[in-house]
């Protein structure tokens, strides 16, 4: 999926497109942009993701998010090259998602009247900042790093700011957080 990513306006009536290297967060008409891919991922990736559950010493295979890096390859890198992953992908030694593996919750399933093997929960509190926001923020800071951003700005009352600040600091990028008056979590 190399050379596959681009930005596209989420408004179907607009549909403006931009290169992935763009720093735009909105299209020229003021609508939000989303990362899109020209091609669908090959079905053989399921096997690759399954095999990566046994990390084989790669921090990017341990990571909850970068284990699926082919689906998030907006950096357009060789996803099997540890050197390229280390250079471009933001990671705290694979800690994001490492401990937050899903657990089978048989007592909760019984309480809900569901099949005891059908309910799995993933404790996101094990992420480095203690927040579920780490999964998305690691990709946001990777994109910021890719486009050469000097600063990340977010509005948050808690989880987003903790995650943004932590990953930005790890990459040497300034981070400004704006909190609405009287809205601290």
Name the predicted role of every residue range.
Residues 1-185:
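PLP-dependent amino-acid enzyme catalytic core
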């Amino acid at each position: 999926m190399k050379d596959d990513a681009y930005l596209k306006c989420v408004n179907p009536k607009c549909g403006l497109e931009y290169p992935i290297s763009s720093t735009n967060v909105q299209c020229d008409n003021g609508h939000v942009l989303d990362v899109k891919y020209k091609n669908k991922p090959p079905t053989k990736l399921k096997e690759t993701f399954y095999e990566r559950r046994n990390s084989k010493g790669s921090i990017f295979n341990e990571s909850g998010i970068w284990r699926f890096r082919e689906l998030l390859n907006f950096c357009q890198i060789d996803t099997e090259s540890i050197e390229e992953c280390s250079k471009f992908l933001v990671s705290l030694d694979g800690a994001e998602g490492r401990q937050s593996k899903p657990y089978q919750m048989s007592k909760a399933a019984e309480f809900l009247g569901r099949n005891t093997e059908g309910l799995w929960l993933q404790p996101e509190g094990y992420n480095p900042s203690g927040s579920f926001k780490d999964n998305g923020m690691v990709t946001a800071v990777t994109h910021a790093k890719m486009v050469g951003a000097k600063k990340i700005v977010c509005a948050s009352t808690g989880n987003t700011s903790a995650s943004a600040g932590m990953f930005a600091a790890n990459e040497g990028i300034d981070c400004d957080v704006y909190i609405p008056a009287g809205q601290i979590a």
